[in-house]
């Protein structure tokens, strides 16, 4: 993948008011979203550290990885997804129904957790996972700005020489 993932995994990050290695944050987040510390996709295992790098720097790639575990058939029905032998689904499959997931979760959160139906518990659980996914994915970029790839394209675009010359004149 071009990165020394193990070195990057040891970088300190601030999470929950504490400084932790990126490795701890990535493993804990993937465990919360997927209930496992790796993703099997396209014939290979993707470590939690590779996954979080994809989340931050290649979000369109991460969106295609089956990170979300969904067991409740009614929640799958809400998403318009047929239940398969696998329990794991991509963010891309969930994305079209995010507003409905949020609406259903807000309704379900009004019910005491012990009194919720399996559907209500499942939709609240999925919303919490989607919210965590969104926060992680946008930890390094502003939503709608296109991410690192778009920024690199802007820097290398046809106006790059003009911007560089203008900055040199400022200095």
Residue ranges of each PLM-predicted region?
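Soluble extramembrane regions of membrane proteins in the secretory/endomembrane system
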Residues: 1-171
